[in-house]
A protein has these predicted regions:
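Active-site beta-strand->loop->alpha-helix modules in alpha/beta enzyme cores, enriched
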Residues: 1-165, 196, 248-251
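The feature marks non-catalytic terminal segments
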Residues: 1-22, 85, 91-98, 110, ...
Length: 253
């Protein structure tokens, strides 16, 4: 059984850097929506280039697609659209097709994710199958239902899982508050790459242009710029994470 001693013994906050995360640690991204993967794309690109095992599990949803984007498109069709957008962005990222899976979980009539036993067991099956050491997902202290419920369920899974595991909870545009333990700083060249990655989610790009006056790409990068300024970094941008360790014994410290 692998132990997460390297991460457990660190002092925080600090930047993710070369050699910080051992390449034998397995990484799972648990995305409540298509595009949550892309929102932390720079960190995940670093891990892919670090040769970590990387799998992305995306919860299917049709939320966030305005009726005006494709008139007469039903909720199931919107979910299919968002799945195609995620597949296209993952292809641009360089993620192999078999490393990206989509999962239909129980929702209410408004397409809100339910925090029920059925969904808990579905997520437990994903974790048991992929056997991750690290799970990335949006922080649960968030105004978005999907982020809150997914985080709650994954925390339950992690607490009852048979192996040590650490959650990397990322700061999102809808995060209310969180502690920053790790961050990935980056400059303009990487920001341009990330913006292109984000624009594959055209339904979200167009919705943000209409409702906010700027695109989805700019919305995420504005957050990344704010994170860098909050941390007092020289870098223009950063992605930020709070860590939660589960099943790591004190004697491993």
């Amino acid at each position: 059984m692998k132990k997460l001693q390297t991460l457990w013994m660190q002092e925080y906050p600090q930047a993710i850097h070369e050699g910080f995360i051992p390449d034998n640690l397995r990484v799972l991204v648990m995305a409540p929506h298509p595009d949550d993967f892309d929102a932390i794309g720079v960190t995940l690109r670093f891990l892919a280039e670090n040769n970590n095992f990387l799998h992305v599990a995306v919860i299917r949803t049709g939320s966030g697609v305005d009726d005006s984007y494709l008139p007469d498109l039903a909720l199931a069709g919107k979910a299919d659209l968002r799945e195609r957008e995620q597949k296209n962005s993952a292809h641009f990222f360089g993620l192999p097709e078999h490393k990206l899976t989509f999962h239909s979980l129980a929702k209410d009539e408004q397409d809100h994710l339910l925090g029920n036993a059925e969904n808990y067991h579905e997520l437990m099956e994903i974790v048991a199958d992929k056997a991750p050491d690290i799970i990335f997902l949006p922080h649960g202290n968030d105004t978005n239902n999907g982020h809150r419920v997914t985080c709650s369920l994954v925390r339950q899974v992690a607490a009852r899982y048979s192996r040590p595991i650490v959650l990397f909870l990322n700061r999102d545009v809808k995060t209310i508050a969180m502690r920053t333990d790790l961050y990935t700083p980056f400059g303009q060249e990487m920001a341009d790459w990330k913006a292109e990655l984000l624009r594959f989610h055209d339904s979200q790009q167009q919705r943000n242009l209409v409702t906010r006056g700027h695109g989805f790409d700019e919305r995420i990068l504005l957050l990344n710029n704010q994170i860098a300024r909050d941390l007092g970094l020289d870098a223009l941008f950063a992605e930020a994470f709070e860590l939660e360790f589960y099943n790591v014994s004190a004697d491993a410290k």
